[in-house]
Amino acid sequence: MAAAMIWWPRFLLLLCLTCKGSTFYVPGVAPINFHQNDPVEIKAVKLTSSRTQLPYEYYSLPFCQPNKITYKAENLGEVLRGDRIVNTPFQVLMNSEKKCEVLCGQSNKPVILTVEQSRLVAERITEEYYVHLIADNLPVATRLELYSSNRDSDDKKKEKDVQFEHGYRLGFTDVNKIYLHNHLSFILYYHREDTEEDQEHTYRVVRFEVIPQSIRLEDLKIDEKSSCTLPEGANSLPQEIDPTKENQLYFTYSVHWEESDIKWASRWDTYLTMSDVQIHWFSIINSVVVVFFLSGILSMIIIRTLRKDIANYNKEDDIEDTMEESGWKLVHGDVFRPPQYPMILSSLLGSGIQLFCMILIVIFVAMLGMLSPSSRGALMTTACFLFMFMGVFGGFSAGRLYRTLKGHRWKKGAFCTATLYPGVVFGICFVLNCFIWGKHSSGAVPFPTMVALLCMWFGISLPLVYLGYYFGFRKQPYDNPVRTNQIPRQIPEQRWYMNRFVGILMAGILPFGAMFIELFFIFSAIWENQFYYLFGFLFLVFIILVVSCSQISIVMVYFQLCAEDYRWWWRNFLVSGGSAFYVLVYAIFYFVNKLDIVEFIPSLLYFGYTTLMVLSFWLLTGTIGFYAAYMFVRKIYAAVKID
């Protein structure tokens, strides 16, 4: 115990330093050096909106197109995210300014949007879509300057807080009129690399910003060389899009370069730095204090009570007298009686082990910086493949538990483990994907990708689950310290607070309270297209979640056994996952208060994916709590003498 108390502060200090550290690039992600006037390619990623949750590819709208459209080959994670990276006609040269350039169209021949195109553009603007571009793999950002008064200052001066919004707004609405951002002012920052005296300077792109503007056709002056002159001052009017008729306009852009002290290795800090890091720290510290405080209280109560009970049981010569006044020892002959549906229980727990291993490895690897944000889709790709390969551990744990519960049909149990949870996930995703297909969104998983996922499931995960299940079933089952009686003991009438649903509500509060702040930022990253890269904090929260789930599970199973109810297997699994109920409640609260979703399909997508999240979280926390309780029950019954 003393060694553990010495080890914990060192562990927390290491994690704090990891949380504080900046993002770094893993080997193999090399910087690109540009020379003067080298082309810097601007690519489009997708269009996104937090109101619809339906991404679209860039050319789903009538933007100017290059002579040849070329889509980048994407990994699994990029496809699942809805990214469709494609080239654009923007001509940008390293450290070369452009005042104003026409993207497409001529001086006497502007771009004409048909009625259908105008209606589509107007619809996307009213749905608050953002356009996402990249230059040298850096996403474009819009600078936001927020002003707040300084309370500590006597003159109440305004302080400027600079934040960055990912992407740029497609347009805006004002007094029931719709306006399109048809001029983009690109601001690219470069870092000059040190070179020898006789060598030419090289440059690296370290930031990519844009200032979107809406400029009316009549206010732009276009010459024969496709150059343009922007209107001066505030005399110009924005470019209106009337969805009921054809619209004429120009798409234009300008390029400005600025030298920066930002080094290439830290260029992502602009996008990943959050102004609310203190909130994370306060949340972590509060959770750690609460968990340690409750750990002390629960440990004192349970350990002192158990020591007293075990000492009394081991001293008593008359077992019958002991049984008349005892609690949890009364059910020693039934506590390890196999529950109903042992195959389903072991299958769910096997999937929970699979999830636990996958999440632990992903968070740990990401915390070390090995899943760089520059590697788009790497996080999701890694998670998918890890879940497949962790099937061997899930199968092994499920097979051994199934044999411990007196199961005999191991082949059927292995198939159930390999298909039950993944089948539910695939079924829900397939139904949602049909709706996304119907909206022609890039978020729809293409048919070849779906076939590839099925091949991964049945070609990698299922055989590995069978392999692990085979060895787990052949291994010696868990050694239960007491024998099970042939005739089940009658269970006395339980008090109201021992009700299963009440237990779920009580047990879920502590784990959810330890993580709900971090849950807010995760929801913001998922549903509001924000970056999330504070995996050091997330790893801390995950450790706290594991500890709190284990504690609550042990306490709940102890009180259940004291009430002489030995049916703890399923109940403990359900109660330990009680925090998933609070995650569902929080998801509903977030939907009502944070998101502006009113249409059916976006709402269906939100609650469909939320269902998957809650189900996965229930499996994860239920598995953690179950194995903690199982170890506890075996420990306490091994400590007493049973005749």
From Swiss-Prot:
Principal cellular location given in the protein's record: membrane
Superkingdom, natural source: Eukaryota
Keywords, in A-Z order: Endosome, Golgi apparatus, Membrane, Phosphoprotein, Signal, Transmembrane, Transmembrane helix
Signal sequence extent: 1-23
Cell location: Membrane; Golgi apparatus; Early endosome
Membrane-side (Extracellular) residue stretches: 24-282, 369-377, 439-450, 524-536, 593-599
Cytoplasmic side: 304-347, 399-417, 472-502, 558-571, 621-643
Modified residues annotated as Phosphotyrosine in this record: Y313
Transmembrane segments annotated in the record for this chain: 283-303, 348-368, 378-398, 418-438, 451-471, 503-523, 537-557, 572-592, 600-620
Function: Associates with proteins harboring glycine-rich transmembrane domains and ensures their efficient localization to the cell surface.
Annotated protein name in UniProt: Transmembrane 9 superfamily member 4
Species in which this protein is naturally found: Rattus norvegicus (Rat)
